[in-house]
Regions:
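N-terminal secretory signal peptides that target proteins for export/translocation
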Residues: 1-18
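Bacterial N-terminal signal peptides
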Residues: 21-33
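Boundary at the C-terminal end of the N-terminal hydrophobic targeting segment
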Residues: 34-40
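Trp- and S/T/G-rich repeat-edge/linker motifs of beta-rich repeat architectures
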Residues: 40-62, 82-118, 125-200, 207-255, ...
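Residue-level marker for isolated small/hydroxyl-bearing positions within beta-strands
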Residues: 76-78, 132-134, 168-170, 202-205, ...
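Flexible glycan-contacting loops in extracellular carbohydrate-active proteins
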Residues: 390, 494-527
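Extracellular/lumenal carbohydrate-interaction signature centered on repeated Trp-anchored short motifs
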Residues: 462-469, 522-526
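Carbohydrate-binding surfaces in secreted/extracellular proteins
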Residues: 466-497
Length: 534
């Protein structure tokens, strides 16, 4: 600011004195107005106009991805496509991330209060609310730091937003906006619902209280896959229009579904792998009685669908080459056995890939630019890692009905707001029996069923409003601040801390933007146009 002071000379006029004060007042005013403007940090906006089309349960994928010219940062936005052990991620939640390519970020962690008194839980999120699904449905209330009971849905307690309505996937029953669209069958059970690509999919299983066995006749029992055409407004599901596939083994069901492009896939609990496309089911892998091969999670990652597998504990890739093992994804710690491992959960958080692995409660982190796996943390502090046993507490638990009951699961990886929430469990989320399991006294059992809130700088997520036709999403950068706006209304904002924040404030110019591409897989809506405003 240039401050000009004019003194009225002896004998000077009142008018000249008044002029001097006017100059002074104007100078002060200009400093108040111009000061903040001069200090304001530049704004960069990624403006995306997109039409998601009719909501048929599809995944919407990537909106854009871009790197800075010096290669220090990668930025992107999109809708994650993931399914973790019978629970699907929120398709309507949009993520905005900043990922340093070389600078390290510290993963902070806090433990939330326990949602139940069981040795496990599974989490799910909808509309940026976090729910615990075991021991009664409960919603996390961050302001009050407590879990609040919710009315149960039944089954896996799964709900999903479809258009402006809510689809409830209950215990053999499906409802849309409270109205039943599929009732329980007269014989057997409908299990593991999945809605995608305008198809309500599920397993119809008739076991007749007998173990797995090869199919002989419908009277003896069966497992059958269904894909039922349905969109909001159709009313009840018409089973006569369903596309079905009778499976080779009675009792087959699933832990994981997935959707990639125009395909729906599911892996059965005894190794069968099946695909629906263009109105037809087909078998890609035969089930094998007595041979373990189970898929527990699915997630879009660039142009692949990654699926977490047991007993390797690795990710398998479904791409144009079929379903194939990815050695070292993730690796095995040298201190533990490489047997009976399970990649149960997968997610994208802050632009990186995270995987939860049984039986030692490992949380692995993969950096896409460095192509590097890191053991982010172990979600249990006991017992010590050992390659002399396969599961924790194998020796102490010997003789009990389930020998590997105290293996350590990472049951959920769920993103909400700026955070990643991870939950733990024993093999079964049972109640602790101090007489049967005294080795977990007095409070070791409480490590099972914990919910951990993890934070890595550079992640922001928000629930988007459903629109018919085009909607505008804007992803803003100002200094170290991230902001998401939909049709002029702010959805969320955060400030990126640490080294990532400093890089963001001093970022280099941007390389050309890749629209409709990125870590969340190809864009899955009807249309998208983008521009960068600076």
């Amino acid at each position: 600011m240039l401050l000009v002071i004019s003194r009225c000379p002896p004998g000077g006029t009142i008018r000249s004195h008044f002029s001097a004060w006017v100059v002074l007042a104007l100078a002060l005013l200009s400093s108040l107005v111009a000061g903040p403007l001069l200090a304001a940090e530049p704004l960069t906006t990624f403006r995306v106009e997109l039409d998601r089309g009719v909501d048929r349960g599809q995944n919407f994928g990537s909106l854009f991805e871009v790197a800075t010219s010096d290669g220090e940062l990668v930025l992107g936005a999109g809708f994650a496509n993931q399914y973790n052990t019978r629970l699907r991620g929120d398709r309507h939640a949009v993520q905005f991330f900043v990922r340093p390519t070389r600078a390290r970020r510290e993963l902070a962690a806090v433990e939330l209060p326990r949602p139940n008194t069981l040795c496990g839980t599974y989490l799910v999120a909808r509309d940026e609310r976090l729910y615990s699904t075991f021991g009664g449905l409960a919603a996390w209330q961050p302001d009050q730091k407590r879990w609040a009971p919710e009315a149960p849905v039944g089954g896996t307690q799964e709900t999903m937003r479809v258009g402006n309505g809510i689809l409830e996937l209950g215990d053999g029953v499906v409802r849309y906006n409270g109205a039943t669209i599929l009732a329980s069958p007269a014989v057997g059970s409908y299990e593991r619902f999945f809605y995608a690509l305008g198809r309500l999919c599920f397993y119809h299983v008739v076991r007749n209280d007998r173990p797995y066995r090869p199919f002989e006749s419908d009277t003896d029992g069966f497992s059958r896959l269904y894909a039922c055409p349905w969109v909001p407004g159709d009313g009840p599901v018409d089973l006569a229009r369903a596309e079905t596939l009778r499976l080779p083994v009675v009792g087959e069901t699933t832990f994981a579904w997935g959707q990639t492009g125009s395909r729906i896939v599911t892996g059965s609990n005894i190794g069968g792998f099946y695909e629906w496309s263009a109105g037809t089911w087909r078998k890609l892998r035969d089930p094998q009685l007595g041979v373990s091969f189970q898929l527990y999670s699915s997630m879009a990652f660039h142009d692949q669908l990654l699926m977490g597998q047991y007993p390797t504990g690795r990710l398998f890739s479904l791409d144009g080459q079929g379903l194939r093992d990815l050695p070292g994804w993730p690796p095995v710690p040298p201190q533990v056995s490489g047997s009976s491992r399970e990649a149960q959960t997968t997610t994208i958080y802050a632009g990186e890939l995270f995987v939860g692995v049984w039986p030692w409660g490992e949380l692995w982190q993969f950096h896409p630019d460095r192509r590097e796996w890191t053991l982010a943390r172990r979600l249990f502090s006991h017992p010590e890692l050992s390659n002399q046993v396969i599961h924790p507490y194998d020796k102490e638990n010997a003789g009990n009905p389930v020998g590997n009951q105290w293996g350590q699961r990472v049951t959920s990886l769920v993103t909400v707001g700026e955070s990643l929430f991870a939950s733990t469990s024993a093999k079964d989320p049972c109640a602790w029996d101090p007489e049967q399991n005294p080795f977990l006294a007095p409070d070791k059992w409480q490590a099972y069923g914990r919910v951990h809130e993890l934070k890595l700088p550079g992640h922001l997520q928000a629930a988007t409003r459903w629109t018919t036709g085009v909607t505008r999403l804007e992803f803003e950068l100002r200094g170290a601040q991230l902001r998401i706006v939909q049709d002029g209304r702010e959805l969320a904002r955060t400030t990126v801390e640490g080294a990532a924040g400093e890089l963001l404030k001093n970022r280099d110019q941007l390389r050309p933007v890749a629209w409709k591409q990125g870590i969340y897989g190809p864009f899955g809506g009807d249309s998208l146009t983008g521009q960068v405003l600076e």
